[in-house]
Curated annotation (Swiss-Prot):
The keyword Endoplasmic reticulum does not apply. GO terms for biological process: antibiotic biosynthetic process; lactone biosynthetic process. S.avermitilis does not produce pentalenolactone itself in vivo but instead a group of new metabolites that are neopentalenolactone derivatives. This is 1-deoxypentalenic acid 11-beta-hydroxylase. Substrate binds at R117, R188. The gene is ptlH. Optimum pH is 6.0. PANTHER family: PHYTANOYL-COA DIOXYGENASE, PHYTANOYL-COA DIOXYGENASE DOMAIN CONTAINING 1. It is an enzyme of class 1 (oxidoreductase).
Length: 285
């Protein structure tokens, strides 16, 4: 399965119904919630990302969020960018935590590891490059040891069908962990990364993707098969600006990834490529 066949289901109306919310999540492995985050807080984080790209010489200082562009994702110091984006303050804001606890139905702990993404459009590029994106994978393959965390992905500016985002294989979490093999088409830090072969994602596990607005959340199970969709926006030409973290019940064990900022992992020269990407020590490369 490689092509998107449908939209996420809007689960926002289920927030007041514990049984219905949990039932949908158990069956489909994700929740798509619209306009549940403080949009002013989201815009503040988006502006911080813009300011970081400007400060590092990658973007026009006069560009608005809608006009912003950079030459390439890889031309920007990924570790340095984390100094500009105050994501921990956003995730742990009382209004954000309230939403997380509505989802879980209990107190939560937000991982100290956050990934930020700022992908320019490749539409019309003579030599488009998508190898920094992620192939089909499951976060639970690399992050643990407990698997009761959920990945929370948010756009910082609007996304369209063309500007990319996350494609989910509906219900794929129910088959548990799958084999991940090296994929030379996707590389980070100069090395190929592991992913799930598309042939291992069933036709019955329909691939879903929808446009999103600031204030929306896409969250999914540790075993959800998902992948990046490239940014090919051209009318308008938009950056894909987003960030994601993991959240788990406060009572659960807190593993390495939960307690270690991504930047600390990335700076550790002793770690292999997947450890740098996920923040989790691993022998699997």
């Amino acid at each position: 399965m490689t092509n998107v066949t449908g939209d996420y289901t809007d689960c926002t109306p289920l927030l007041g119904d514990r049984a219905a919310l949990d039932s949908f999540y158990e069956e489909h492995g994700y929740l798509f919630l619209r306009n549940v985050l403080d949009r002013d807080l989201v815009k503040t984080v988006a502006e911080q990302m813009r300011e970081g790209l400007v400060a590092l010489g990658a973007a026009d200082p006069h560009a608005t969020l809608e006009e912003l562009t950079i030459d390439s994702f890889e031309s920007v110091d990924e570790v340095a960018m984390h100094d500009y984006v105050k994501y921990d303050a956003f995730w742990n804001n009382p209004s954000t935590i309230k939403v997380f606890e509505q989802v879980f139905g209990e107190p939560v702990f937000v991982f100290l590891s956050t990934t930020i993404r700022y992908y320019p459009s490749q539409a019309g590029s003579e030599e488009p490059s998508f190898h920094y994106l992620t192939p089909f994978h499951q976060d639970g393959f690399y992050i643990g040891p407990n698997q009761d965390f959920r990945t929370f992905w948010i756009p910082l500016i609007r996304t369209t069908r063309e500007s990319g985002g996350v494609a989910l294989a509906d219900g794929s979490h129910r088959r548990g962990k799958r084999d991940h093999v090296l994929n030379e088409s996707f590389r980070r830090f100069g090395h190929p990364v592991r992913g799930i072969p598309p042939t291992e994602v069933s036709e019955d596990e329909h691939l879903l993707h929808s446009p999103m607005e600031p204030g929306d959340i896409l969250l999914f199970h540790a075993h959800m098969c998902h992948k990046s969709i490239p940014n090919l926006s051209k009318d308008p030409r938009l950056m894909r600006m987003s960030m994601d973290t993991r959240v788990q019940p406060a009572k659960s064990h807190r593993g390495f990834n939960a307690m270690t900022p991504w930047t600390e992992s990335a700076k550790d020269a002793s770690k292999g490529i997947m450890a740098k990407i996920t923040g989790t020590p691993t022998d699997v490369e």
